[in-house]
């Protein structure tokens, strides 16, 4: 069989067949063919994020890791094309590299030193209280300001914009849902906090009105009726928007490979 060049355009069926061959038979030739075809895609994304800087080759290498991961995890049953799945996977690896690079180069020493202390505090407080600690509890435990805790956690991509154990009304029948219900909970301690709090990174999928609903009912702990009164809409409308927002957040977390919540 003639090997396609990296500029060859494969049909969706051909891509799906090659991926199936690799996933089910560990066919390395199929993997090599896919890598050859999609190398240009990785190069293009690496160039976009390197912007001519010296670390372009580093981004290209981590982008290839993302491509290999996409080949390994892609499921055609989901319905989206391989390209639609691979692009955010590759970008996720690139952004993770840039995040780690920024952390190591630009983060002040005091923030780097506080990070391990926060991890220790979260582990101990979680054990003592059997729940994820709040920012103010971590600050009090470490005898530092809440601002320092937030700054450290934010720079480490693990700050708590939403209290993950805090419940909100899911419907007018009084049932409730927490963010942990949205993303699931398998981890304890710092890793659990670190992963669940990355929910903040997908809030952009919500409309302005949906963000208002989440802010009022979740962060400000207002009832659906109070929220409706503030926004000038019915409680039923609030309930519908809230369910829609929760669904969007759940789907965004599932689809975004950089979240690492699965």
Curated annotation (Swiss-Prot):
Keywords: DNA-binding, Sigma factor, Stress response, Transcription, Transcription regulation. Residues 224-243 bind DNA. SUPFAM superfamilies: Sigma2 domain of RNA polymerase sigma factors, Sigma3 and sigma4 domains of RNA polymerase sigma factors. It comes from the Bacteria. PROSITE patterns: SIGMA70_2. Interacts transiently with the RNAP core. This is RNA polymerase sigma-B factor. It comes from Bacillus subtilis (strain 168). The gene is sigB.
């Amino acid at each position: 069989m003639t090997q396609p060049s990296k500029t060859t355009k494969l049909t969706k069926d051909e891509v799906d067949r090659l991926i199936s061959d690799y996933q089910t038979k560990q066919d390395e030739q199929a993997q090599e063919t896919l890598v050859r075809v999609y190398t240009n895609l990785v190069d293009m994304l690496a160039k976009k994020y390197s912007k001519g800087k010296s670390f372009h080759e580093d981004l290209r290498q981590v982008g290839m890791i993302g491509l290999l991961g996409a080949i390994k995890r892609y499921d055609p049953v989901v319905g989206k094309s391989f390209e639609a799945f691979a692009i955010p996977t590759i970008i996720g690896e690139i952004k993770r590299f840039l995040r780690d690079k920024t952390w190591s180069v630009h983060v002040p020493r005091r923030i780097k030193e506080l990070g391990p202390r926060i991890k220790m505090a979260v582990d101990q407080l979680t054990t003592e209280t059997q729940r994820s600690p709040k920012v103010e509890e971590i600050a009090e435990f470490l005898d530092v300001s809440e601002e320092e805790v937030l700054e450290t956690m934010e720079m480490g991509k693990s700050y708590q914009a939403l209290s993950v154990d805090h419940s909100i009304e899911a419907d007018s029948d009084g049932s409730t849902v927490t963010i942990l219900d949205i993303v699931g909970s398998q981890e304890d301690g710092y890793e659990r906090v670190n992963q669940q709090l990355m929910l903040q990174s997908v809030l952009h999928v919500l409309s302005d009105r949906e963000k208002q609903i989440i802010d009022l009912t979740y962060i400000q702990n207002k009832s659906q009726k109070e929220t409706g009164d503030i926004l000038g809409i019915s409680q039923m409308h609030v309930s519908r928007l809230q369910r829609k927002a929760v669904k969007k957040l759940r789907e965004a977390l599932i689809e975004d490979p950089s979240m690492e919540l699965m």
